[in-house]
Regions:
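A glycine/proline-hinged amphipathic helix-loop "lid/cap" segment
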Residues: 1-73, 322-325
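Short beta-strand element of the alpha/beta-hydrolase
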Residues: 87-98
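Short amphipathic alpha-helix adjacent to the substrate-entry channel of hydrolases
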Residues: 106-125
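Alpha/beta-hydrolase active-site loop
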Residues: 134-156, 313
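Gly/Ser-rich "nucleophile elbow"/oxyanion-hole loop immediately N-terminal to the catalytic nucleophile
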Residues: 151-166, 186
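Hydrolase active-site cap/lid region
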Residues: 181-236
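Short beta-strand/loop motif that positions the catalytic acidic residue
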Residues: 259-261
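Catalytic active-site module of serine/aspartate enzymes centered on a nucleophile-bearing elbow/loop
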Residues: 302-325
Length: 325
């Protein structure tokens, strides 16, 4: 692949040695196990003050008998808390990636610990319902339900309801901005910022980046089609703005945004198009394309470019939260 960064080449070589089949060739359970093998590292954990996991009640009209919605809260240590006055710790609500089918609280534990440690914020990871067991709009409704609950319970955390941001990667980036849309549409909470890492924003497969990277071993067109087929309930769901936020009638009133894309990613063009639409709607937007990198690169901290992107996000969130990061 022309102009692929040497680090990305090394990553593909390493993943290739594991002989993991593409998601589209697996069952949902098999795809979940494969992602856990790749992302759950056995190295030393990033230290934070405390990690708690607890359930919240799903919305009464969800019609789902699967039980409560689990949240995992990463609390900063005393040094991190020292960045903020009492009762003013900011909150980052994080939605993991995985095509709405795979990924979980553990696959993205390292990234949540990183943001908590670097920012001194509370990071709340959302264990939303996954497809195909729970198709659209289950994940979208869970995304907003978690955000609303956090906004209503900030005193529980000693946090500030005025400094909440959302973030997510890939399908989680989709859910982060969908939660922001729902917060705008349904009366809050107000958000300071949204961080969208190579987000899926449109149920379409005809962009230049899809054509150029259709067979990319990190994320292919076939895999994205497989994800969407599992996620959507019916033929018209893909046009709903809570599934395809790029198709929202307007994006006015959304929080400022940082959109990260990767040069060798089928989702690059739709991420860029969404950043352009946000900016066109008057939303303060920063778009950074990491040319030569692959989808999901930020989840691999051994990559220098991943750490550059992480530092960019930390700086942007620090400014949004009223602190240098």
């Amino acid at each position: 692949m022309a102009d692929l960064h040497p680090e990305a080449t090394e990553l593909l070589d390493e993943l290739g040695r594991r002989n993991l089949p593409p998601s589209a060739a697996l069952s949902p359970a098999g795809a979940r196990a494969a992602l856990r093998e790749v992302l759950i590292e056995r190295g030393p954990e990033i230290e934070v003050g405390r990690v708690r996991q607890f359930p919240i009640e799903r919305p009464g009209d969800s019609g789902d008998p699967s039980g409560d919605l689990a949240l995992r809260c990463y609390e900063p240590d005393e040094d991190g808390r020292g960045n903020w006055a009492d009762g003013s710790i900011p909150i980052l609500v994080y939605y993991h990636g995985g095509g709405w089918v795979r990924g979980d609280l553990d696959t993205h534990d390292e990234l949540c610990r990183y943001f908590t440690s670097e920012l001194g914020c509370l990071t709340v990871a959302v264990d939303y319902r996954r497809a195909p067991e729970h198709s659209f709009p289950a994940a979208a409704e869970d995304a907003y339900a978690a955000l609303r609950w956090v906004g209503e319970h900030t005193p529980v955390f000693g946090a500030d309801s005025r400094t909440i941001a959302v973030a997510g990667d890939s399908a989680g980036g989709n859910l982060a901005t969908v939660a922001a849309l729902a917060a705008r549409d349904r009366g809050g909470p107000d958000l300071r910022h949204q961080v969208l890492l190579y987000p899926a924003t449109d149920h379409a497969f005809d962009t230049d980046s899809y054509d150029a990277h259709a067979e990319n071993p990190m994320l292919s067109r076939a895999t994205m089609e497989w994800y969407w087929e599992h996620y959507l309930s019916g033929a018209f769901d893909g046009a709903h703005p809570y599934a395809s936020p790029l198709r929202a009638r307007d994006l006015d009133g959304l929080p400022s945004a940082t959109v990260i894309t990767a040069g060798h990613d089928p989702l690059r063009d739709e991420g860029e198009a969404y950043a352009d639409r946000l900016a066109g709607a008057g939303v303060e937007t920063t778009h950074a394309d990491y040319g030569g990198m692959l989808h999901a690169f930020v989840s691999f901290p051994a990559l220098e470019r991943a750490n550059e992107a992480r530092e960019q996000v930390v700086g942007t969130l620090g400014e949004a939260f009223g602190n240098g990061g």
